[in-house]
Swiss-Prot record:
Organism this protein belongs to: Mus musculus (Mouse)
Pfam family, any one: CD225
Protein name: Trafficking regulator of GLUT4 1
UniProt keyword Phosphoprotein present: yes
InterPro entries, sorted: CD225/Dispanin, CD225/Dispanin_fam
Pro residues bias: start-end ranges: 1-10
Length: 173
């Protein structure tokens, strides 16, 4: 049943006529800062197609027709609409992938502290999977923890070997 207090839902292929002029006004105000002639694209005057996407936003806008090249002095609307995703993508590409210290974790598995040596190996693998998922901060944190635990268990293993050799050769037979 439809609730009379709520406005009726629109078809995904239609937009209200009030939305397009408001959007055009906003874009005009942004682009008029340089006081240059505007070349508004046909995507604002034409109908907009809304398409369901699989992300957190419920819809994405796909314009009909070709996009016209923007003026060289004014920023393009395409880049201004997608500035946050472009900045995020370029920022993620500029950062180098954090180290996961997998080789160090595998090397620590050869020390005599055997069951505990699996812990840095697990953290190293978790760090590698975090990089693949795009969580660079989590991958960096897990990589540092894997490095710390690997070095700790290697030192502990060396101490155990020194104690075992010392006890073995100092005890009279």
């Amino acid at each position: 049943m439809a609730n009379p207090a709520q406005p009726p839902l629109q078809d995904p292929g239609s937009t209200s006529p009030l939305e397009l002029p408001e959007m055009e006004k906003l874009l005009t105000k942004v682009e008029n800062k340089d006081d240059q002639a505007l070349n508004l694209s046909k995507s604002l005057s034409g109908a907009l197609d809304l398409e369901q996407n699989g992300h957190s936003l419920p819809f994405k806008v796909i314009s009909e027709g070709h996009r016209q090249p923007s003026l060289s002095g004014s920023p393009s609307r395409v880049s201004s609409r997608r500035a946050s995703s472009v900045i995020t993508t370029s920022y993620a590409q500029d950062q180098e992938a954090p180290k996961d210290y997998l080789v160090l974790a595998i090397a620590s598995c050869f020390c005599p502290v055997w069951p505990l040596n699996l812990i840095p190996l697990i953290f190293s693998i978790m760090s590698r999977s975090s990089v693949q998922q795009g969580d660079l901060d989590g991958a960096r944190r897990l990589g540092r923890l894997a490095r710390l635990l690997s070095i700790t268990f290697i030192i502990l293993g060396i101490v155990i070997i020194i104690v075992a050799v010392t006890v073995n050769f100092t005890v009279p037979k």
